[in-house]
Amino acid sequence: MSASTMTPGEIVSELDKYIIGQNRAKRAVAVALRNRWRRQQVEEPLRHEIHPKNILMIGPTGVGKTEIARRLAKLANAPFIKIEATKFTEVGYVGRDVDTIIRDLTEYSIKQTRELEMRRVRTQAEDAAEDRILDALVPPSRGTSGEPERGEDSNARQTFRKRLREGKCDDLEIEIEIAQPVPQMDVMTPPGMEEMAEQLRGMFAGLARDKKKPKKMKVKEAFKLIVEEEAAKRINEDDLRTAAIANVEQNGIVFLDEIDKIAARQESGGADVSRQGVQRDLLPLVEGTTVNTRYGMVRTDHILFIASGAFHLSRPSDLIPELQGRFPIRVELESLTAQDFVRILSDTDASLIKQYSALLGTEDVQLDFKPDGIERLAELAFSVNERTENIGARRLYTVMEKLLEELSFDATASSGKTITIDAAYVDAQLSEAASSQDLARYVL
């Protein structure tokens, strides 16, 4: 099922496979995605006036803020970029300016669209590559003009075509003309001058042209290179750019992480000048403006912005009022409980238990996680979070890594065995580190 036609309920069900809890946040992003489809059904000129409702997610680290946005973008197959607000500085200061967010998003969309187009023309490209390789293996007769005349395949050519498709010619060496890729010119510019760097790269790329050069290689390697070359010939670059820019403008998603770090705190001093400057620079992007990229002008009016932050030392009200108004939907994410940790370990589609079982399974070591072992792991992770820094579900990575440290190191010695992970095994491996606050701080 295409994500563009999924109902909010179906989107939430899909997110439930990877993220435990946080139903309010899931519902908010599901409605935002569905509203994109609804907007496309509205007639112009009203359609142009309907803007996405940007979302502000508030919650401690490790509760699923980033994962929700990442899974949503994957589900929607939309251009998506995650950036940290702290990476940017006010225009005029040393550092990256906020326009690079849209440039990076456009680059991603170009790559995504190119891959889609490559898949579309792949069959034609493979047929052309097959003919070129057969020309090298069984040269066709030449006509009066000197051009190859393939006509009907000769018996020898048909035989080689059959062998080629069966993979029996893969190790034969042939000499074939391959386009030499133009070396990428890397332009070094001071921070804040990314636009100039893009223009210079485009200028140098326009001066260079691909040159063909005869090269000896095996058929298998040659086939792969020729398919890429033939596919590139069949793609119209202008149409590709137009489609990629339209995809960014209509479906792009920007995830602004750590937005609380650029919120001005009332008790702090001079550093707030730059923080407020970044907020002011973000305003036109979020509200809707035009950004110049190497592929053309990109409008940001219908790009969805999802901001997130823990807001431990500041509050959403510490953001400048204009920026607060650009994020009308606010969702608070709850801290995770020990029971949530149990579900994260066992219920999600790509749970840590499945990941580690698959990794050690490659060495013929079978892991058998018992329910009491999973519960004990969750309790230990939750306990360490309460006594030290609360890093949410990320604590499970540390706990699992420590639990299986010895086993991972000596996996070959346990080849062919089944290791039972129950509460006793977990206590034997982790109880000392978990019970000592000093050890827990540094080890877990």
From Swiss-Prot:
Region (Disordered): 137-162
InterPro entries: AAA+_ATPase, ATP-dep_Clp_protease_ClpX, ATPase_AAA_core, Clp_ATPase_C, HslU, P-loop_NTPase
NCBIfam families given in the database record: hslU, PRK05201.1
Main location: cytoplasm
Protein name, UniProt field: ATP-dependent protease ATPase subunit HslU
Keyword set, alphabetical order: ATP-binding, Chaperone, Cytoplasm, Nucleotide-binding
The keyword Ribosomal protein appears for this protein: no
Gene name in the database record: hslU
GO cellular component, one term: HslUV protease complex
Disulfide bonds: none
Locations listed in the record: Cytoplasm
Keyword Chaperone: yes
Family of this protein: Belongs to the ClpX chaperone family. HslU subfamily.
A GO BP entry: proteolysis involved in protein catabolic process
